[in-house]
């Protein structure tokens, strides 16, 4: 008597319904990571364009396009790493690695999404499109081997945040402030080093099995680098609040932008607490969304900054002259 073989779970996963394919593609695009792209709105805030409807629409378009740029990187990396990911318990459940989403379908999605994203980016601003291309090239360089180069790996992680800030300024056609560049880069290095610190604390002697470059980072080295970057981040932001020439004239005179410094200090200290005491820090965007005190602090900083910039800017219509 013959029995009919039942398809295995993995075989079933390889034949998703047509309705589930868009959801699987979306999952592979990592929408949780899109929160990083909020940094594209920094130029809108600090260039005093947050009441300009045209600038707001351009910033929203830039946000959406950068989400697509980063998502295409995730799709391509998951296609390339599908065999390796299928053997790793941490990544085996990803749609492509598990077989739930055929890699050919994912490749087709990239073939459609990426050209459209570049065309729309070019129409928004050619320089914005160039930054998008540089961002993708940076991510591919990281994925294809540069992530194994000590120190450079951290700079590449951090550069993604700097490129986002630059792209946001280009999208709304405002000058790129030297303070935006310096503070963003130092803050991004702070997050990147804490990511490495978290991995070393969490994995201990097995850290190199997770990421080979971790063999090159001793706890003492990470501590020294973090000390330098943390102090530099606080100092650079503090200097910005009372020396930046792109602040509205009244704020340059009354120095009230310094009221935002405590929020930055608390945010940095809270993040260090979460890394050292709670073993978090592997994903900055998830930490921000999950930790209520840090989220509240970020919102208060943004609201306070926007309020001060608006009240003391010409767009408020308030005359602060003698």
What are these regions (language model features)?
Residues 25-32, 94-106, 123-126, 146-154, ...:
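Short, amphipathic, aromatic/basic-enriched membrane-interface segments that mark the entry/exit
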Residues 66-75, 114, 135-140, 269-270:
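Central hydrophobic cores of alpha-helical transmembrane segments in multi-pass inner-membrane proteins
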Residues 2-26, 144, 162-322:
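C-terminal membrane-associated helical module and adjoining short loops/tails
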Residues 82, 87-132, 178-189, 223-234, ...:
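Multi-pass membrane catalytic core of lipid/isoprenoid biosynthesis enzymes
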Residues 41, 45, 115-119, 137-141, ...:
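Alpha-helical transmembrane segments of multipass membrane proteins
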Residues 1-86, 99-112:
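Topogenic membrane-insertion module of multi-pass membrane proteins
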Residues 69-97, 146, 152, 193-201, ...:
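Acidic (Asp/Glu-rich) catalytic motifs at the cytosolic membrane interface
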Residues 36-57, 146-178:
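Long, highly hydrophobic alpha-helical transmembrane signal-anchor segments
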């Amino acid at each position: 008597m013959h029995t009919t073989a039942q398809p295995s779970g993995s075989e079933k996963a390889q034949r998703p319904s047509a309705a589930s394919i868009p959801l699987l593609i979306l999952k592979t695009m990592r929408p949780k990571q899109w929160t990083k792209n909020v940094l594209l709105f920094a130029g809108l805030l600090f260039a005093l364009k947050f009441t300009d409807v045209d600038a707001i629409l351009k910033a929203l378009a830039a946000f959406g396009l950068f989400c697509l740029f980063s998502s295409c990187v995730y799709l391509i990396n998951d296609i390339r790493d599908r065999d390796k990911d299928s053997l790793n318990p941490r990544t085996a459940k990803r749609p492509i690695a598990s077989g739930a989403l055929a890699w050919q379908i994912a490749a087709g999605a990239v073939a459609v999404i990426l050209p459209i994203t570049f065309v729309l980016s070019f129409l928004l601003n050619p320089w914005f499109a160039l930054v998008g291309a540089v961002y993708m090239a940076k991510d591919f360089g990281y994925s294809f081997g540069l992530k194994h180069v000590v120190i450079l790996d951290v700079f590449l992680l951090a550069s993604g945040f700097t490129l986002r800030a630059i792209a946001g300024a280009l999208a709304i056609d405002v000058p790129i402030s030297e303070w935006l560049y310096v503070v963003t880069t130092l803050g991004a290095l702070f997050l990147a080093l804490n990511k490495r610190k978290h991995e070393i604390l969490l994995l201990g002697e097995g850290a190199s099995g997770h990421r080979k470059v971790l063999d090159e980072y001793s706890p003492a080295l990470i501590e020294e680098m973090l000390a330098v970057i943390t102090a530099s981040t606080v100092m650079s932001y503090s200097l910005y609040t009372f020396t930046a020439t792109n602040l509205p004239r009244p704020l340059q005179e009354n120095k009230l932008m310094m009221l935002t410094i405590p929020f930055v200090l608390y945010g940095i200290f809270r993040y260090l607490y979460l890394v050292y005491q709670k073993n978090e820090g592997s994903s900055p965007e998830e930490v921000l969304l999950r930790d209520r005190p840090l989220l509240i602090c970020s919102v208060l900083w943004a609201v306070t900054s926007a309020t001060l910039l608006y009240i003391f800017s010409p767009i408020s219509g308030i005359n602060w002259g003698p």
